[in-house]
Amino acid sequence: MVGQAGHYRWQGEDLILHCQLQPKASGDDIVGVHGDRLKIRITAPPVDGKANEYLIKWLSKQFRVPKGNIKILQGELGRHKTLGIHAPRHLPEEAHICFPK
């Protein structure tokens, strides 16, 4: 996939990622693109911000960035989220994201 898709865009060095989160799943993984969002499953429950904290920690490993480089831009209380990931060093294949040219 070349260029930008509906589930992400680049703003300089920042990756803006539109996600659909499935908390309290049986495992952690990137399911794939569903419509204009990237579906992500995590085991953390959606209680007291635990799912958001876990999501940031887990994504920091996937994109190989410090946790502080990932921000929830929209959707802090919902399953549909927009994330900002500053200067990702790795793009997981299952996320279907390309580095900008």
From Swiss-Prot:
Recorded GO cellular component terms are: cytoplasm
Q: Which SUPFAM superfamilies match?
A: YggU-like
Annotated signal sequence range: none
Name the InterPro entries for this protein: DUF167, YggU-like_sf
Q: Which family does it belong to?
A: Belongs to the UPF0235 family.
Q: What is this protein called?
A: UPF0235 protein CJA_0091
